Amino acid sequence: MGAKEKLEAMLNVALRVPSIMLLDVLYRWDVSSFFKQIQRSSLNNNPLFQYKYLALNMHYVGYILSVVLLTLPRQHLAKLYLYFVAALLLYAGHQISRDYVRSELESGYEGPMHIEPLSMNRFITALVGQLVVCTLCSCVMKTKQIWLFSAHMLPLLARLCLVPIETIVVINKFAMIFTGLEVLYFLASNLLVPFNLAKSAYRELAQVVEVYGLLALGMSLWNQLVVPVLFMVFWLVLFALQIYTYFSTRDQPTSRERLLFLFLTSIAECCSTPYSLLGLVFTVSFVALGVLTLCKFYLQGYRAFMNDPAMNRGMTEGVTLLILAVQTGLIELQVVHRAFLLSIILFIVVASILQSMLEIADPIVLALGASRDKSLWKHFRAVSLCLFLLVFPSYMAYMICQFFHMDFWLLIIISSSILTSLQVLGTLFIYVLFMIEEFRKEPVENMDDVIYYVNGTYRLLEFLVALCVVAYGVSETVFGEWTVMGSMIIFIHSYYNVWLRAQLGWKSFLLRRDAVNKIKSLPVATKEQLEQHNDICSICYQDMNSAVITPCSHFFHPGCLKKWLYVQETCPLCHCQLKSLSQQATGESGSSTNPVSEQSATNPPLGPVSRAEVTTEPLAAVPTRSALEQEPTMDIKVSGSVEKRIGELEAHFSQGEANLNSNEVLQRLQAKGEANPEDLNVKALPPECEHCAEI
């Protein structure tokens, strides 16, 4: 984005902020109390204020005008502001002319001005002011006809011509009328412009809705108006005005405790309307986004933005603040109560930001510990951030206990802080284990189990903390004041933080226990079998000093296969089902009733092989890597008719003749005259290769 585009984007936001401020003022304005004040004042006899319903309608018209100003295109909005500036300049010219005429009437001097220094000074000052006004008006309206804005210079010309003072007053009134007529002519000539704009806007909106739908229209308006940035700038302006008003009326210095109270009360003052509350929501979202971006930049530098340029974070914290503010009726409270409730909500938002920071730091820290990167600066940044995430949540929980009376909401904040510290402890412990393994010459035995036990320990502690929170909430609901909102929070907290965590932990425990049982049920390869196999582990691609043999006669490291079985219950190579001893016994009892089981054991079927149909062959028949490298290659050429007939025969074999091997299939095809030796150019295979191909 170039400098011009950035300037246009800034103007697009800055020109729309007054419309949001006008909406906020109209929401604060109480029309009924306003008319009661007028009835007590001297303005009650003014005919303008005697039509209450007309003023009420003007109040709603103000809302409509604010929305129109908010949704106008940027070019038309800039023109409107320029016209408004021109009107202000004309009013300034009128004020200069009126003040000059009044000063001349008070002096009573009607002679030549060069004789009277004071009269000359008044004339020069008024003349310079009128020239500046005319020049600025011509620049704003982009016209060279400067005489259109010089009507207020007529009293000055009359005074230069020694016209009597009474006549100058009449000339000044004529200049005012002439300027007013010019303004009315301009308004009349542009009277249909709003109608034409509304007509064209309606036509464009109808086309967009017809082609893309309402959702696309809403997203387009959201992006064009830059709603988050617009409300954030609006709220920051309100907050700055509030701080300026406080310090401009205070002469004494403010203490640190007073500054904290001032900060909270200023935020509370800027949350009294729905528009200012939305501004605070978007401001918190951008602050959270900035903190998380700085966190990732601190850990990874500029590489953090190469893989994650969008950084769509921060909205969770803003939505959390909005939901809590709406549910608790934040904008309807008094300022002091609003500041107290807002402090609790901000604590919840800070706890959510800390949890998001941990979600960013955890994979980066663990990846840094597992890698061989020896940069001390990278490790220092990772460890220092983890230490901050360990200490700050604990300090925040301590401060909450010191300044607030304990209730269910505060207990949720404290539990969230404690859980964050526990997660950081687990991350640091695993990082230390990775670093110890890095400095050792040999890998640590059962490192995966150690990491699992560490994760399981702090997951169990998280579960216990969540369970304590639920127990406290239930006791407070039963013996204290019962509310629907509190019951909903307890139910949601119980489901997500207790039930789902318990279910996930139990499922992980069962998977690991089943994987351990499967590994124990597999035979361990001897040294002669490993030498005869002469291969590497297909999972880690390392030489095998120890291995287990699967039912499908594949060799793997016990630790590698156990990690694989944590994810899925199949062989990594052929994807046969690997079952435990109890499941194998069940499968064998079911397969004993099969009349063709013995034949299937000797001659495996063509096609997919299940685990119940696979038998452990003698290791001499299992093909090794050296044996396969010495075998000749196969050159198979099958015609279309033969391929079709093979499919039919396979379907026939699956119904009761599954004991036929590939050689018998070819013999049957040749006996029926449906296959010639030229069509099937298959070299003879050794028994072990044929067995491998069938599996």
UniProtKB/Swiss-Prot annotation:
It is a multi-pass membrane protein. Residues 585-603 have a biased composition (Polar residues). GO terms for cellular component: membrane. SMART domains: RING, RINGv. InterPro entries: HRD1_E3_ubiq-ligases (IPR050731), RNF145_RING-H2 (IPR047823), TRC8_N_dom (IPR025754), Znf_RING (IPR001841), Znf_RING-CH (IPR011016), Znf_RING/FYVE/PHD (IPR013083). It is found in: Membrane. The keyword Translocase does not apply. Keywords: Membrane, Metal-binding, Transmembrane, Transmembrane helix, Zinc, Zinc-finger. GO terms for molecular function: zinc ion binding. The keyword Hydrolase does not apply. Residues 585-610 are annotated as: Disordered. It comes from Xenopus tropicalis. The lineage of its organism: Eukaryota, Metazoa, Chordata, Craniata, Vertebrata. The chain crosses the membrane at residues 53-73, 77-97, 123-143, 146-166, 168-188, 225-245, 275-295, 316-336, 340-360, 384-404, 410-430, 460-480, 482-502. This is RING finger protein 145. The gene is rnf145. A zinc finger (RING-type) spans 537-575.
